[in-house]
């Protein structure tokens, strides 16, 4: 089996994006360049969405209320990823709205302590995402909520990949800058995979309207967030990549719920 192929890239992407136990052999003697492996980010996201969806299905099967099932799915995602993207969202909120200069914003984003803006953002974000999953369960069923999680987690990581490619590093020499930047071919491949999984996740319940809604909303909000990043800190950091994923996932879910 080609360990530098798409399967290998998916496993190595899971190794970066999650804390799932993975075979070490897939990481030995391979081209493990993150910008190259990143084409498989949407596939890794789809796997994480599938596992979170299974948790939601189990919660629904044992007659837990939709709110509990939705929160369990959100918690499962955070547990599997080590809250990697949620941490980025919180740090971005603290930095962007807790300081008045780019350098000070970047300093705050590096601080591991959680501030008021981060706390409020994460509470509101979790509540909105849970309410959207509840709406999908109520209007279409838990099985379609599972499909929605697959599509959402895949497409949001494709959006994160495009965001990573489009913006310059805001902190030259920092950790995110040292990881490099994906090439255009990687972005095209990743976005194609993300679109395919989004279609699989959304078409059965919401049809083409849901798919178009999600694509338009994701494009608009990620473009707006990219402009905000340039205005606030002059580019991207690892935290803003995580925030982009969270923003994209919520936009996609809103697009689906609008169509149900």
Swiss-Prot record:
- Bilayer-crossing residues are 42-62, 64-84, 117-137, 144-164, 192-212, 214-234, 240-260
**Enzyme class name:** transferase
Q: Which GO terms describe its biological process?
A: cobalamin biosynthetic process
* Keyword Magnesium included in the entry's annotation: yes
Q: Which EC number(s) does UniProt give?
A: 2.7.8.26
* Reactions performed catalytically: alpha-ribazole + adenosylcob(III)inamide-GDP = adenosylcob(III)alamin + GMP + H(+); alpha-ribazole 5'-phosphate + adenosylcob(III)inamide-GDP = adenosylcob(III)alamin 5'-phosphate + GMP + H(+)
Q: Which GO terms describe its cellular component?
A: plasma membrane
Stored Pfam families: CobS
Places the protein is found: Cell inner membrane
Q: Which cofactor does it need?
A: Mg(2+)
Q: Where is the signal peptide?
A: none
User: Which membrane topology describes this protein?
Assistant: Multi-pass membrane protein
InterPro entries linked: CobS
Keyword vocabulary terms for this entry:
Cell inner membrane, Cell membrane, Cobalamin biosynthesis, Magnesium, Membrane, Transferase, Transmembrane, Transmembrane helix
Pathway, according to UniProt? Cofactor biosynthesis; adenosylcobalamin biosynthesis; adenosylcobalamin from cob(II)yrinate a,c-diamide: step 7/7
Annotated GO MF terms: adenosylcobinamide-GDP ribazoletransferase activity; cobalamin 5'-phosphate synthase activity
What is stated as this protein's family in its record? Belongs to the CobS family.
HAMAP family referenced in this protein's UniProt entry, alphabetically: CobS
Main role?
Joins adenosylcobinamide-GDP and alpha-ribazole to generate adenosylcobalamin (Ado-cobalamin). Also synthesizes adenosylcobalamin 5'-phosphate from adenosylcobinamide-GDP and alpha-ribazole 5'-phosphate.
Q: Can you say what this protein is called?
A: Adenosylcobinamide-GDP ribazoletransferase
Organism listed in the record: Brucella melitensis biotype 2 (strain ATCC 23457)
Which gene name belongs to this protein? cobS
């Amino acid at each position: 089996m080609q360990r530098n192929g798409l399967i290998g890239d998916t496993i190595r992407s899971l190794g970066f994006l999650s804390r799932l136990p993975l075979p070490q052999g897939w990481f030995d003697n391979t081209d493990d360049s993150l910008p190259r492996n990143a084409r498989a980010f949407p596939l890794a996201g789809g796997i994480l969405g599938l596992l979170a969806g299974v948790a939601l299905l189990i919660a629904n099967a044992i007659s837990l209320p939709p709110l509990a099932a939705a929160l369990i799915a959100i918690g499962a995602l955070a547990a599997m990823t080590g809250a990697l993207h949620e941490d980025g969202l919180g740090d971005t909120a603290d930095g962007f709205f807790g300081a008045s200069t780019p350098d000070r914003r970047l300093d705050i984003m590096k601080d591991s302590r959680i501030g008021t803006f981060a706390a409020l953002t994460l509470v509101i974000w979790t509540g909105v995402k849970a309410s959207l999953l509840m709406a999908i369960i109520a209007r279409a069923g838990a099985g379609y909520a599972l499909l929605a999680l697959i599509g959402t987690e895949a497409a949001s990581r494709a959006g994160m990949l495009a965001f990573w490619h489009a913006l310059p590093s805001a902190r030259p020499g920092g950790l995110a800058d040292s990881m490099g930047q994906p090439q255009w071919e990687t972005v095209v491949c990743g976005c194609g995979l993300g679109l395919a999984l989004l279609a699989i996740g959304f078409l059965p319940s919401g049809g083409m309207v849901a798919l178009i809604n999600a694509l338009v909303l994701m494009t608009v909000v990620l473009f707006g967030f990219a402009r905000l990043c340039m205005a606030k800190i002059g580019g991207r950091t690892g935290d803003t990549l995580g925030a982009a994923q969270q923003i994209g996932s919520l936009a996609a879910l809103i697009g689906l719920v609008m169509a149900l």
